[in-house]
């Protein structure tokens, strides 16, 4: 049994399609990065305000000494949410650096507070919050891919 196969290929259409994709790629990458960076900042902020670690679980409890302090009594939430005035999480932002984005704290004092909370410097317990959990990491990959494909016209 012999089969005949004829393939018709329009090279002009293929070339134009590839040009369109390559033209839209830089903008698509930057916009997709901005979208996932905003999502990452939202997730870090939201989970921290709920007192959750990035991969689940709760932060180490406040010390008994802190629970007796005037500062603690002024606090709205009595669970560990790393918020006293709200300046640290409000200064969390992202910036585009070419084909990568970085998450950072806008003010130096908030950066220092975040480092102390995240690493547990001195007598402070470790309360890792400035990270992306596995579940959110997969969601970020999905958001990036869908937005990128939409903007480039792939698929």
Placement of each model-derived feature along the sequence:
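Short, Lys/Arg-rich flexible segments
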Residues: 1-155
